[in-house]
Amino acid sequence: MQKHDLLYSGKAKSVYATDNPTQIIMHYNDDATAGNGAKHAVIADKGILNNQITTLIFKVLKAADIPTHHIETLNDREQLCQKVTIFPLEVIVRNTVAGSMAKRLGMEEGTELDNVVFEICYKNDKLNDPLINDDHAVALGAASYEDLDTIYELTDKINQSLSALFAACQINLVDFKIEFGRTAAGEIVLADEISPDTCRLWDMQTNNKLDKDRFRRDLGGLTDAYREVLRRLQQLELE
């Protein structure tokens, strides 16, 4: 598989064309951002860790019959993926109150929710990715109601699989954000990544944060936290 022209450079990943028009190579960078890019740093090995963690998680999701864009992991930083048309939406799943939900609704961070909360945001940097509802998404042309039904069905399955996976690692899956895309064949699949960059992960015993909040909140120790998540996932895989 030959890597060709750069197609897209994002906050934490770069996407390259290949000699197969239906496939792309996703390269994980070491950039860390917060506040929609307002805060930025380069943290050695972060991209390698996220690539390894995402690979393990997508393997678990594949075993649960959840379709993803991942084909194979090529090396420390790169994955071969299906080329998809990304829905301009972020789907956020909240199992515990944290982050913007706590601020927006005046709820105490760490409160366990009786019901899982799904949110969608419109991916638009100029608008700071506003929170929208299903009707907004359809009015914007971002997705159809049928698309959203499929996305929510997949999201529920993903949350169940990930919650069980992390619980087995003694980690609480507080919340996470995911993206979906449509393949050339028309199938809606999970795209992008699932890593401590995109999840809030708290140690079950100590509530120690094992995610990008260590960067957002200037707590330090980001790579140590990501390595710990990877270690626990790898240990679980060996058992």
UniProtKB/Swiss-Prot annotation:
Keyword DNA-binding among record annotations: no
Sorted alphabetically, which keywords does the UniProt record give? ATP-binding, Ligase, Nucleotide-binding, Purine biosynthesis
SUPFAM superfamilies named in the record: SAICAR synthase-like
HAMAP family named in the record: SAICAR_synth
A Pfam family: SAICAR_synt
Q: Which terms in the Gene Ontology molecular function aspect does this entry carry?
A: ATP binding; phosphoribosylaminoimidazolesuccinocarboxamide synthase activity
Instruction: Give the first-level EC class, as a single word.
Output: ligase
Q: Record's PANTHER family?
A: MULTIFUNCTIONAL PROTEIN ADE2, SI:DKEY-6E2.2
Name the family.
Belongs to the SAICAR synthetase family.
The EC number on file is 6.3.2.6
Which GO BP terms, alphabetically? 'de novo' IMP biosynthetic process; cobalamin biosynthetic process
Taxonomy of origin reads: Bacteria, Pseudomonadati, Pseudomonadota, Gammaproteobacteria, Cardiobacteriales
Which pathway does it serve? Purine metabolism; IMP biosynthesis via de novo pathway; 5-amino-1-(5-phospho-D-ribosyl)imidazole-4-carboxamide from 5-amino-1-(5-phospho-D-ribosyl)imidazole-4-carboxylate: step 1/2
> What reaction does this enzyme carry out catalytically?
5-amino-1-(5-phospho-D-ribosyl)imidazole-4-carboxylate + L-aspartate + ATP = (2S)-2-[5-amino-1-(5-phospho-beta-D-ribosyl)imidazole-4-carboxamido]succinate + ADP + phosphate + 2 H(+)
Keyword ATP-binding attached: yes
Name of this protein: Phosphoribosylaminoimidazole-succinocarboxamide synthase
Q: Which organism is it from?
A: Dichelobacter nodosus (strain VCS1703A)
